[in-house]
Design a protein with these regions (language model features):
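Solvent-exposed helix/loop surface patches that form functional interfaces
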Residues: 116-194
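Short hydrophobic/aromatic-rich motifs at helix boundaries and adjacent loops
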Residues: 1, 20, 38, 156-157
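Acidic, serine/threonine-rich low-complexity disordered tracts
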Residues: 20-97, 101, 166-254
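Intrinsically disordered, low-complexity peptide-like regions
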Residues: 4-5, 22, 118, 222
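Bacterial N-terminal signal peptides that target proteins for export
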Residues: 1-9
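Short helix C-cap/helix-to-loop transition motifs enriched in small/turn-promoting residues
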Residues: 72-79, 108-111, 121-126
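Mixed-charge, low-complexity intrinsically disordered segments
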Residues: 87-113, 138-145
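Bacterial N-terminal signal peptides
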Residues: 8-16
Length: 254
């Protein structure tokens, strides 16, 4: 179960480096320029179906997190992300009681955690992600285990540098030692306040103790036109992960 929770956190960090009046034909250039020191709260929810020990299990996870832009220099914004609360349930009382003990340990550990990322005006993470507020041994463990997520986010370009209009599509690709990803994005709608972007892609996580993980993802998200931030409640995605013949299906919203 702890390994599964780590996988969810990896997905969150991964995932983590995503109206009114149509404006057909308008070309826009996306910029990530959030207002400094103005927190944005997201409610991450996931329903995951998997097979554990020959039994089908459905797990629900809820995580409340806060992202705060704290500084900006040369077009790069520093973001501090905190996990404010988290819970998980399977609908099985015995399993939930056992999981609650681990969850309380996670919550206590995460209560002081600040995930620090650097994001440029294209919305891409740059540099190294740091994990502040943790005991040294845990900080080192996070840095080691999540390093692949940082490298992956740094290489994957979510928005093109050229202007795009409603109906335009573009691709994002990254290939490395730990992960490969090929994704296609489409600007579905442009309004005065928001950009609606759909996405679909395939991802391969390599060099994992549990074997190579193949993931497909499809979903959509809205971005605030003024700040470039994801609009809370608009991110929706469905994922399928396969490893060693086992399949995990997830529905995610944020």
């Amino acid at each position: 179960m702890k390994r599964f929770l780590h996988f969810l956190l990896f997905s969150f960090c991964l995932l983590a480096a995503i109206a009114c009046g149509k404006k057909n034909g308008e070309k826009i250039t996306y910029r990530f320029v959030p207002e400094l020191n103005k927190p944005v709260v997201y409610n991450f929810k996931s329903t995951t179906e998997m097979n554990v020990g020959g039994k089908d299990v459905s797990m629900q996870m809820v995580m409340k997190m806060q992202m705060t832009p704290t500084a900006r220099e040369n077009g790069v914004t520093t973001i501090s992300t905190q996990i404010l609360d988290m819970s998980a349930s399977t609908g099985n009382e015995e399993a939930d009681r056992s999981m609650e003990q681990s969850m309380q340990q996670f919550k206590q550990l995460f209560s002081t955690l600040h995930i620090i990322t650097q994001v440029n005006e294209r919305g891409n993470t740059v540099g190294k992600t740091s994990y502040e507020g943790l005991p040294k041994e845990y900080a080192a463990m996070f840095q080691s285990q999540m390093g692949g997520s940082t490298d992956f986010s740094n290489n994957l370009k979510y928005f093109p540098e050229y202007p795009i209009g409603q109906g335009d599509s573009w691709t994002g690709k990254t290939h490395g030692d730990k992960a490969d990803c090929d994704a296609t994005y489409t600007l579905e709608e442009v309004t005065n306040d928001a950009l609606t972007v759909s996405f679909k892609g395939k991802m391969t996580l390599k060099n994992n103790p549990q074997g190579t993980i193949h993931i497909t993802v499809e979903g959509s998200c809205q971005y605030n036109r003024k700040t470039g931030m994801n609009i809370p409640g608009t991110f929706k995605a469905e994922t399928k992960a396969t490893s060693a013949g086992q399949q995990v299906k997830s529905t995610v919203s944020m």
